[in-house]
């Protein structure tokens, strides 16, 4: 995950631009704040559980908005995404909103974004609520749901690596 991932995904999904959570500190940077607001970002306090933002995100999904979320919750340049820990927020939000999930994988050489480095955007098939909750049996298991969704995202990267050989 890199700082420009939301911009790349917005460009790839032009028909329905997703909104994004961004750490609240970014909204105090004079040049950056207007740009991220224009991309539909809204602030989140990462120092603890920001219940207001979670509820806002659930409501946005319930009302048909697209929301881009990153299961890892932070950037780890140069690290294979499949080896990174996953946070439970994505699972909690998606299961409470009964949202369909569109997995997106950004493939870049060495897992590091760079100026003029080519990026391949791989968009998978939507994951319905019934699938990631096991027919509703795992509805409250946010950690499981986040890991399941993230595994489906990582599969996109693995499948594309297999095709390149």
Could you say what each language-model-derived stretch is?
Residues 53-165:
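Non-catalytic C-terminal accessory region of glycerolipid acyltransferases
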Residues 1-48, 56:
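Catalytic core of membrane glycerolipid acyltransferases/transacylases, capturing the structured
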């Amino acid at each position: 995950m890199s700082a420009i991932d939301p911009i790349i995904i917005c460009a790839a999904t032009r028909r329905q631009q997703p909104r994004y959570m961004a750490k609240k500190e970014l909204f105090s940077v004079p040049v950056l704040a207007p740009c991220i607001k224009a991309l539909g970002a809204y602030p989140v306090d990462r120092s603890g559980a920001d219940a207001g933002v979670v509820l806002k995100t659930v409501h946005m999904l319930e009302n048909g908005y697209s929301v881009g979320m990153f299961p890892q919750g932070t950037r780890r340049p140069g690290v294979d995404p499949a080896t990174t820990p996953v946070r439970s927020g994505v699972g909690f939000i998606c299961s409470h909103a009964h949202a369909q999930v569109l997995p997106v994988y950004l493939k870049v050489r060495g897992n590091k974004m760079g100026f003029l480095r080519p990026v391949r955007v791989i968009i998978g098939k939507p994951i319905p609520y019934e699938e990631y909750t096991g027919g509703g049996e795992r509805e409250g298991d946010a950690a499981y749901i986040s890991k399941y969704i993230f595994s489906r995202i990582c599969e996109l990267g693995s499948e594309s690596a297999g095709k390149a050989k």
